[in-house]
From Swiss-Prot:
The lineage of its organism: Bacteria, Bacillati, Actinomycetota, Actinomycetes, Mycobacteriales. Gene3D superfamilies: E3-binding domain (4.10.320.10), Lsr2, dimerization domain (3.30.60.230). This is Nucleoid-associated protein Lsr2. Residues 58-78 are annotated as: Disordered. It comes from Mycobacterium leprae (strain TN). One of its GO terms (molecular function) is acyltransferase activity. The gene is lsr2.
Amino acid sequence: MAKKVTVTLVDDFDGAGAADETVEFGLDGVTYEIDLTNKNAAKLRGDLRQWVSAGRRVGGRRRGRSNSGRGRGAIDREQSAAIREWARRNGHNVSTRGRIPADVIDAFHAAT
């Protein structure tokens, strides 16, 4: 019997819908990730804009925003779910949401 696992990322802020993107931001030396709908991601960026424009950039990437382009190509939700399922079956420790470690993604691609 085949088993199909579907993972749906839900907006972490209000839980009102499926998340469209993962937004990364930092404060006091701590980096955070939050899964948001496009509407809430735009609101977060808008709310932070005045603070960012008054601040100084001290590091980080100089790239345009993307959903998950980490140099390996974007991973869609179906592929992410498949990688997580493969990782668990093969003894890798992965969370149910958020970023999948690069070594797990590399191992998945090497095995498939």
